[in-house]
């Protein structure tokens, strides 16, 4: 199923503009025509790989994100499936990723970076208190608005202590430059793994490169 601008999803969400595309799927800026508000729509790609495995992962992302109500976590509004394609309807965050900010500016003064890190840590604390481990904390998944508000995004490889294991034992999950030593060894991630990754993010922002 090819997604195009103007297409209506679930008779409610209009696709306005593709924001990103990867191996797992596409992310669109959309519009909720019932509530008249912008939304972000993450759609599974059905033309590559094991579609059922991807759907299983997307369902897990929806499950893990559903109850994480916090100002520093991008909210999930709805999950919908049609013709073997899954759609995550999420809060639209008009902002730049911390990765974009690092790329444009190199380093940030501690007085500017610290509030970003604090907000990210608060969001992670809420996720951890619900038994959810992000497992892919990195600048690209930390959105920062023009007012300095932070939203953690993309729980696509997250793990919940209340769900069945999706990844195989020994499988490395996350982005290599930011994952904790235990993740790099294929061991189970813990809340401390996310904090380690946030430490790498902090180091990069202060020094201009990763440790």
Question: Could you tell me what each predicted segment is?
Answer:
Residues 43-67:
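AlphaC helix of the eukaryotic protein kinase fold
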Residues 83-97, 101:
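Conserved short submotifs of the Hanks-type protein kinase catalytic core
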Residues 116-117:
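Activation segment signature within eukaryotic-like protein kinase domains
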């Amino acid at each position: 199923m090819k997604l195009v601008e103007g297409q209506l999803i679930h008779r409610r969400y209009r696709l306005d503009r593709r924001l990103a595309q990867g191996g797992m799927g596409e992310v669109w800026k959309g519009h909720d025509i019932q509530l008249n508000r912008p939304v972000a729509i993450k759609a599974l790609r059905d033309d590559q790989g094991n579609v059922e495995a991807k759907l299983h992962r997307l369902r897990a992302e929806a499950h893990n994100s559903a109850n994480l109500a916090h100002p520093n976590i991008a909210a999930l509004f709805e999950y919908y499936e049609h013709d073997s394609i899954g759609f995550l309807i999420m809060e639209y965050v008009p902002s730049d990723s911390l990765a974009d900010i690092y790329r444009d500016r190199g380093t940030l003064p501690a007085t500017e970076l610290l509030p970003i890190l604090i907000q990210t840590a608060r969001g992670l604390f809420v996720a951890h208190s619900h038994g959810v481990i992000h497992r892919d904390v990195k600048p690209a998944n930390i959105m920062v608005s023009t007012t300095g508000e932070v939203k953690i995004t993309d729980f696509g490889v997250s793990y919940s202590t209340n769900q069945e294991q999706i990844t195989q034992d020994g499988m490395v999950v996350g982005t290599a430059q930011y994952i904790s030593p235990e993740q790099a060894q294929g061991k189970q991630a813990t809340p401390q793994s996310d904090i380690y990754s946030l430490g790498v993010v902090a180091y990069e922002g202060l020094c201009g490169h990763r440790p």
